[in-house]
């Protein structure tokens, strides 16, 4: 076990030592290093008595953690009184004179409770600020991509609409306002400063781009197609003159042959002459 002496207390309770877990406790002497044994102590909390079984060489801090589960009070908000004296969490029970059936009193420490709540609030504020800075960093990365795209267009001789540049500037300034509302110390303060420097750099770069963009020549508008060029194929074909339209018009007439009614009736009234066969037929009886 690693031990480190850090001085002697003024109360005469002996020197302190550092345990492997990082807890500084009362240093044990050779004559007090007897075999540990279990004891039962009675702890009064308000009007309720709790009987706790614990090792005699445990600390008051370990006793507080056991009492926390039984009473619901946070162990950092407790004060244990033994023989009309408050006992420190780092002190051992046996070295303080605690024996089997000893009586102790547990009270809540309002000052310790307030300190703990303030510390918890500080931790929560730090986490909230860190998350807010992370969100701003994500948005700044996205806006930096737009800035890079505009820089590429203007660098190649193109021109960006002034409205797009103004919108990007407004979004960058909004992120600066959000960042200014975040407060914090340590890592939060360092991260905030880094994002502020980054945003200021992008704002300056955008100002230069706006000046450069204003000097770019105006892009020629696309030519408007004439109405004749927008006609469909069939409309165009209907408007083109055909080869036959250039020649004089052809007049088609019909000559009707008239027949006299008398001649027609005569032709119909003429008898039909029989046709004699050219072959000679032999008749047999």
Curated annotation (Swiss-Prot):
Any single Gene Ontology cellular-component annotation: cytoplasm
Residues covered by the BAG domain: 132-210
Disulphides: none
Chain ranges of the Ubiquitin-like domain: 37-113
Keywords (A to Z) from UniProt: Chaperone, Phosphoprotein
Modified residues (Phosphoserine): 244
InterPro entries: BAG_chaperone_regulator, BAG_dom_sf, BAG_domain, Ubiquitin-like_dom, Ubiquitin-like_domsf
Stored Pfam families: BAG
Gene Ontology molecular function: any one: protein-folding chaperone binding
The protein's role, per its UniProt record: Co-chaperone that regulates diverse cellular pathways, such as programmed cell death and stress responses.
PANTHER family: BAG FAMILY MOLECULAR CHAPERONE REGULATOR 2 (PTHR12329:SF33), BCL2-ASSOCIATED ATHANOGENE (PTHR12329)
Assembly and interaction partners: Binds to the ATPase domain of HSP70/HSC70 chaperones.
Protein name: BAG family molecular chaperone regulator 2
